[in-house]
Amino acid sequence: ERVPIYPDTLAWVHDFTYNFNEPMFDKYFWHPAYDEYPVVGVSWKQAKAFCHWRTAYKLYHLPEERRVFETEYRLPTEAEWEWAARGGRELAMFPWGGPYSRNVKGCFLANFKPLRGNYWADGYIYTAPADAYIENDYGLYNMAGNVAEWTETAFDPMSDIFASDLNLSLIHISEPTRPLRI
């Protein structure tokens, strides 16, 4: 099966039909200012295809004697993703360990909205750069908020029924029954 290699560059337009003049829609995928931002608009199949491509690319550039020791790239399982997101903190609510979403200065510790429709409160109306917030104890950034990640396995049988006030229908998701980690 052929899988398109490029993300859905109209990912946000599906929900905001009349916002074609919004610079984010036009520039996010192509402008160098967004090089360190997360990839969005990618289906589960596209994420899997990228893993396959990345494995082949790496193996192609390795000497023959090292190829047997290399593992393939793949999506993490939900359990692996959660383990990485927690950063070694077993009982913590957030990857940074504390029960609070703001630091002592009142600044948000992740890219998420505190109230329905309040997208500016964390400093970013859409996504945030990959290193915009403090990393967890494993050195991973944005493991709470920002964008959703695809996983190989599902967390819950109902994980395909995800809704938010940004997108109530998810009609444009090409693989709605695949695991999605929020």
Labelled PLM ranges:
Residues 4-170, 174, 178:
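Functional-site microenvironments in short loops/helix caps that host divalent-cation chemistry
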